[in-house]
Amino acid sequence: MLDLEVVPERSLGNEQWEFTLGMPLAQAVAILQKHCRIIKNVQVLYSEQSPLSHDLILNLTQDGIKLMFDAFNQRLKVIEVCDLTKVKLKYCGVHFNSQAIAPTIEQIDQSFGATHPGVYNSAEQLFHLNFRGLSFSFQLDSWTEAPKYEPNFAHGLASLQIPHGATVKRMYIYSGNSLQDTKAPMMPLSCFLGNVYAESVDVLRDGTGPAGLRLRLLAAGCGPGLLADAKMRVFERSVYFGDSCQDVLSMLGSPHKVFYKSEDKMKIHSPSPHKQVPSKCNDYFFNYFTLGVDILFDANTHKVKKFVLHTNYPGHYNFNIYHRCEFKIPLAIKKENADGQTETCTTYSKWDNIQELLGHPVEKPVVLHRSSSPNNTNPFGSTFCFGLQRMIFEVMQNNHIASVTLYGPPRPGSHLRTAELP
């Protein structure tokens, strides 16, 4: 049984690990994976058709804990302990819930002190006792007790007339004064762990199409002095098609991983693929997982030729590998009486809306099957790749965008060289 410390408006954890409000989803999953022998039977709950309409939940079924992540920014918003019989809880080092101590109204009063009068929810038949960043829900035994809990008669804990021994049914940790109005806080400095995160990514474009990326980056920078004085650093960097490896490294720092392409599975869809001369060396990616961005370099010139932006929607094969990339892409409208106008495509745009702005692709989509090995199937199904305006949109079956690949302009003279090949 887990023995955890409750910190209102902040966290739930122990000496080895801590679930902190504002923590990105990937870090919470990393904690669960590291301690999989202790924390077992974890479920990932999400809406398959409408992933933005409901919170993303990690359900620790064995331990009676639910971690609720904001559907948009994917940071931890609420920590719910839904079954207090499966976990030990303490506050300021003193237990208020264990096998020997029941979490009664008297015990909560002793451990946390007085607070504002509670609120009775007749629909749930639950009584909610609220502290700042912390709420307890008590189960009422019958509807006949409801009049005792009307707010007009509640002037403090002593006047609530909770039946002796009534115990907590649920506990919530959140940011602010109201559970209903709470939002996921900004990522705490303790969660950066030396990484740089992207607050936003703007796609820069010229007259012909995408030209590069402008990234607004966040880092936990600490100047001279103690780590406790660390502050959030916000800065902007730009990278462009044609930039060298050294340019990108100086702008964004070292990638988390370098991946060399062993084959190009999309090559067959290019003009005259059988005429292309096989390369002796392979193109390679810089994978920036916390930025949600991949950068592809040409094997011969070592210059940027593609950017890949990842949305990290649940139900996609690459889910939880990348932090969500909050991108904005200006689109050139292909409509009557809309010459010169632009609209913006974001991480949350749906493919139907993008098609209305850009026009329907001339060619049918390429169906993309992903699996960990040739003999395995992908439980999430295939995705569909559409090409428009030097961009490839990978579309999931629920109409959301899984990734966007941006292509640089063709190199001068490349068509001539291709035509001269035997």
Curated annotation (Swiss-Prot):
Signal peptide: none annotated. Keywords: Cytoplasm. GO terms for cellular component: dendrite; phagophore assembly site; synaptic vesicle membrane; trans-Golgi network. Its main location: cytoplasm. Pfam families: PHAF1 (PF03676). It is found in: Cytoplasm; Preautophagosomal structure. GO terms for biological process: Golgi to plasma membrane protein transport. Plays a regulatory role in autophagic activity. In complex with BCAS3, associates with the autophagosome formation site during both non-selective and selective autophagy. Belongs to the PHAF1 family. PANTHER family: PHAGOSOME ASSEMBLY FACTOR 1, UPF0183 PROTEIN. Interacts with BCAS3; the interaction is requrired for the association with the phagophore. This is Phagosome assembly factor 1.
